[in-house]
A protein has these predicted regions:
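DNA major-groove recognition helix of helix-turn-helix/homeodomain DNA-binding modules
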Residues: 26, 43-60
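Interfacial/linker helices and their anchor residues that mediate assembly or domain coupling
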Residues: 65-104
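S-adenosyl-L-methionine
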Residues: 98-137, 141, 151-152, 158
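Conserved proline-anchored active-site loop of SAM-dependent methyltransferases
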Residues: 128, 143-156, 165-169, 305-326, ...
């Protein structure tokens, strides 16, 4: 599916006309029409603006666009598949390379940044930390209190002597342990396990909890059978694994199935079209170990009362979209308590619901800021308060953010681009 078709499908699914998109984003209707019809490619800025508006992962849109460009270049070249295979083998991981390329390189590991996740700050990391470094000093301990994908923490680990990260999701917590945790692990043992899983034949595997509930919806049936079988085996092998090895296997499973899930990047719904079966070949994630990191899975407002940090980075969910519901498939996969699922999206009973996604958000944010013991606060804010979609509309206005932070100390406000959508507040506390 080409980038224009992807954007058109997303727009139509969310119920917007081209004229409405023009009014909300500033991108001309004529440009949007040419993009959706495949006449032109969207620019980086247009991709970022549209991704923010639709609340989807801009990295995935960029991958779609760049793959379209590659196909355009090679469409008249003979032996296209062989050319692509050789090109993939020549690619080297240079910084934040695209996972779609890295996954095709023999021996390459899957990077932390490659997971599809709403609100991921990967594109903004350098900008965020350039501002932080210019406006702070003497940082010994830094905290990422709503860690999400972990990309902010990853940057902190290379800048500061001590780092604290926190998130309430079970899937995120296990991913942090896998990518960053300092406990022992054997690469040989993990590689052996992955080879074992990659040799499985789905035709020889019986239906299981995962395939019965998610097969034919989020994944093709054969892949769903493999996922369920592998997850059960990881659980049965837990006594033979270290804490980090257990986490690595789970995170590796999540990262490998993430890019082929039949979704728009989250599990609020699946795409109601036939799923093209694809093989499941697990590649290891980019495992690292850090001794200067503490990993928590707590309510951020409660954790705020018990930690002391020179810098706290804050990026809560501002709109109604509950992350525990958007990523319920991964929560179920990690917890493996096999709950009874319901609804079209096959969700478990609601749990781990954030006050920041409700009308209680201003009160929760005020409580958080008041109880943090820190020299500096860095607060990200995406300005979707007046969004047409109720689920996208922020529960805290930028004015409320400013007022609450001003009670804590001296506030500086920075905007990432001219449309005043993405802000970073730096607070030097009193």
């Amino acid at each position: 599916m080409y980038i224009g078709t992807v954007l058109k499908n997303i727009r139509e699914e969310q119920g917007f006309s081209l004229l409405e998109i023009q009014k909300k984003t500033g991108i001309k209707e004529s440009q949007l029409c040419r993009i959706e019809s495949g006449i032109r490619f969207p620019t980086d800025d247009q991709i970022f603006i549209l991704a923010k508006f639709y609340n989807i992962d801009s990295n995935q849109l960029q991958i779609q666009r760049e793959s379209d460009k590659v196909l355009e270049i090679i469409k008249n070249i003979p032996n296209q598949r062989q050319v692509l295979d050789v090109a993939k083998q020549k690619l080297e991981s240079n910084g934040n390379y695209l996972s779609v390329a890295a996954d095709s390189i023999p021996g390459a590991t899957i990077p932390l940044e490659s997971r599809r996740y709403i609100g991921c700050k990967q594109k903004l990391v350098d900008w965020i930390f350039d501002i932080i470094k210019e406006n702070t000093s003497g940082i010994k301990t830094a905290t990422d209190i709503f860690a999400g994908t972990g990309v902010i923490t990853k940057k902190m680990l290379h800048l500061y002597p001590n780092v604290i990260m926190n998130d309430t999701l079970y899937s995120n917590h296990i991913i942090y342990k896998a990518f960053f945790g300092n406990s022992e692990w054997s690469k040989e043992k993990i590689t052996s396990k992955l080879s074992e899983y990659n040799s499985l034949n789905p035709k020889e595997i019986n239906d299981n909890y995962f395939s019965v509930n998610f097969g034919g919806k989020y994944f093709d049936y054969d892949k769903a059978k493999l996922i369920g079988f592998i997850r059960e085996d990881i659980e049965n092998s837990k006594s033979e694994l270290t804490e980090k090895e257990y986490a690595i296997l789970l995170a590796t499973l999540i990262y490998n199935i993430d890019k082929t899930a039949n979704t728009l990047g989250h599990f609020e719904a699946y795409i109601k079209k036939p799923i093209k079966p694809t093989p499941l070949k697990l590649k290891l994630i980019d495992v690292q170990q850090f001794s200067n990191l503490q990993i928590f899975q707590e309510d951020s407002n409660e954790l705020a009362r018990s930690i002391n940090s020179d810098l706290v980075y804050i990026d809560p969910p501002y709109n109604s979209r509950q992350y525990s519901r958007f990523y319920h498939v991964y929560e179920t996969l990690v917890k493996w308590d096999k709950p009874v699922l319901s609804g079209v999206a096959m969700k478990p009973p609601a749990e781990n619901m954030s006050k920041y996604c409700t009308s209680q958000a201003p009160k929760a944010f005020s409580d958080l800021i008041e109880n943090l013991d820190a020299k500096y606060l860095a607060v990200s804010y995406n300005n979707t308060y007046n969004s047409k979609s109720g689920s996208l509309r922020n529960h805290i206005t930028i004015k409320q953010i400013d007022e609450i932070l001003s009670r804590k100390g001296n506030v500086e406000k920075f905007s990432w681009y001219d449309d005043n959508q993405e802000f970073l507040f730096i607070v030097k506390t009193r």
